[in-house]
Amino acid sequence: MAKTLFDKVWDKHVIAGKKGDPQLLYVDLHLIHEVTSPQPFDGLRQAGRKLRRPDKTFATIDHNVPTAPTPVTSVESVMDQISKLQITTLQKNCRDFGVELADIGDKDQGIVHVIGPQLGLTQPGKLIVCGDSHTSTHGGLGALSFGIGTSEIEHVFSTQTLWQVKPKNLGVHVTGHLAPGIFAKDIVMALIAKYGTNFAEGYALEYYGPTIDEMPIENRMTLTNMIIEGGAKVAMINPDQKTFDYLRGRERVPKDFDKAVEYWKQFKTDSPDAYDWIIELDVSDLAPYVSWGTTPSMSVPYGAKLPAVTDKNIERAYDYMDLEPEMPVQDIPINWVFIGSCTNGRLSDLKEAARVMKGKHLAPGVQAWVVPGSRGVQKAAEKIGLDKIFTDAGCEWRDPGCSACLAMNPDKVPAGMHCASTTNRNFEGRQGPGTRTHMASPAMVAAAGINGHFVDVRKFYQGEA
């Protein structure tokens, strides 16, 4: 019987339970951060339990850490007392339970879903969990990864296992060559715009097809990261030679790397017949996507007009966003820019944004923050001069962290601002109370910052702008 990539990794990790019932899974890697770990650690203390496998647990500080003024080197840089408490609590918990921590200022510190692949902790065939909804990111390297809740975190702490009901298989077959200026972000935004925010509920989603085969690894992780906004719990891509080349030489990969590669090669879907549902997506004529409303499904391709009001949700979104029905995308004003996050905070993302901004300057009245996804990304970007391109354009170059993706740290976008953002969520108040978020690719966001409104970035890549 044909199996999917997801089936194969899942089956390798089943300890107990029948098909169709909850099954007990072994967890290879548990990633934790300061926001969702305090209560589970307290639960261990109250029960008098030890952490089952500290060697399979890795912690970082990302959600609450400030990213300016640089350098942010210690918890003393944190002014918000609630944020400081969460950070110092994680530091103490890691000391008490023997967990490795990428602390503030450490060379490995950064967003949890950026540093996992960067360090080589993320590997094909692994089962990875984290108390964060965008844990599916790691599926871009062929791992089975998903977000878990507080009680589940404590269960993994105590047993290194987790009870789960196996979801069905959804294949997204992507064909067509991406035009210059079109990126993975546009693909996933187009999917969610067409099918909605819950179409993949109850499914493990796998992207496949010639477009995916051509795609660089960091772009693949954008796909697996953001499809959570379409309802999927798990998103995966078959590991291939690009995956193995990406991982080779990274700090935490197996010592006998070639032997590991031979093991990883088994993790691939046998046949599309193994999927329960297949979506076909031809991206040959895909345009850059921009979100206009307050859910990721409220997005349109460049060149389209915003939709007419057809229900109260759309009416409320227009009221919050201070936009007019059927206005052109290019008429959306932009006065703030954020480049970063676990969706688009990697080196390749910063390169594309810098490519657009090089030799130009932000439009009058526009403020921009560029926040690398990790200390490693920051150093690599500075080594090739990306920081100077951004600062010459008028942007602030900051230290790594989740930053303005979410209003949980000092990096809040002011109320009323229209922010072009490379993030994955555009809910009301997501980037700060009253903030209006417009998601797009790093290239589109950079171009919007230069022009003060959205433009067709494809023209830049065609040498016309």
Swiss-Prot record:
Residues where [4Fe-4S] cluster binds: 342, 402, 405
Function comment: Catalyzes the isomerization between 2-isopropylmalate and 3-isopropylmalate, via the formation of 2-isopropylmaleate.
The keyword Iron-sulfur belongs to this UniProt entry's keyword annotation: yes
Catalytic activity of the protein: (2R,3S)-3-isopropylmalate = (2S)-2-isopropylmalate
EC numbers, comma separated: 4.2.1.33
Co-factor requirement: [4Fe-4S] cluster
NCBIfam families linked to this entry: leuC, PRK05478.1, PRK12466.1
Assembly notes: Heterodimer of LeuC and LeuD.
Domain of life: Bacteria
Protein's gene: leuC
Keyword vocabulary terms for this entry: 4Fe-4S, Amino-acid biosynthesis, Branched-chain amino acid biosynthesis, Iron, Iron-sulfur, Leucine biosynthesis, Lyase, Metal-binding
Any one of the GO BP annotations: L-leucine biosynthetic process
Pathway: Amino-acid biosynthesis; L-leucine biosynthesis; L-leucine from 3-methyl-2-oxobutanoate: step 2/4
Molecular function terms from GO: 3-isopropylmalate dehydratase activity; 4 iron, 4 sulfur cluster binding; metal ion binding
Similarity remark: Belongs to the aconitase/IPM isomerase family. LeuC type 1 subfamily.
Annotated InterPro entries: 3-IsopropMal_deHydase_lsu, Acnase/IPM_dHydase_lsu_aba_1/3, Acoase/IPM_deHydtase_lsu_aba, Aconitase_4Fe-4S_BS, Aconitase_4Fe-4S_dom, IPM_dehydratase_rel_enz, IPMI_cat
UniProt name for this protein: 3-isopropylmalate dehydratase large subunit
UniProt enzyme class: lyase
Note on cofactor: Binds 1 [4Fe-4S] cluster per subunit.
